[in-house]
């Protein structure tokens, strides 16, 4: 037990430091871009830092994840709103609406649900597992969501859906739907959320790797690959911890 606690502490510290370094380096690249708005970058950095803490606490079943989640999502909402005002782009407004009316309320739902399942400032949440009916509902919803998301993104991008299969747009749709699904499973304390977050990070690594091979800003994209690699490691750690938490429950 003592050795396991030391291992968990060391692994969490490694993941936390790795994520934070990746965030810092990412923002260094952004500051150097022409027309960079330093205040908004600083605000986004605060959100990114709290987001890192949020994910590590979530992996450990700590209810304070939602406090940092509220800060992270609130900052992301402000940044998305600012981008929408400046660009007027429909996808950006969609990002604002997603954060303001979905991810932000789900932080409070998560706090309430985790409290119902035994979590407090000293105790980890009593994690749950999906039953067969819930698995079927989740997979059906995921398939419908990805299909609808792919069609919408193709329309927004001006592509013919019946034309060449556009796998990068499909991956964008998959990541979007998995993020929505993962938040639901997280807020309701289901262990299976970590399967979803693992997929999110794997697809994100693939997408950024693809950009790294085709973009002139290869240094920035490589940093993003490293960043999501740490997120993937955190997801694997979360699966390990939550598997035990749900078994104990």
Annotated model-derived regions:
Residues 147-160, 173-192:
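Alpha-helical transmembrane segments in multipass membrane proteins, preferentially the mid-helix core
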Residues 29-33, 78-95, 155-164, 212-222:
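Helix-coil boundary and interhelical linker segments in multi-pass alpha-helical membrane proteins
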Residues 54-68, 184-196:
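Membrane-helix interface "capping/anchor" motifs
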Residues 24-38, 56-61:
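Short, hydrophobic transmembrane alpha-helix segments
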Residues 29-47, 95-104, 162-175:
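Structural signature of hydrophobic alpha-helical transmembrane segments
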Residues 181-249:
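C-terminal transmembrane-bundle signature of multipass membrane proteins
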Residues 1-17, 132-137:
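N-terminal membrane topogenic signal
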Residues 71-117, 122-126:
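Hydrophobic, ordered structural segments
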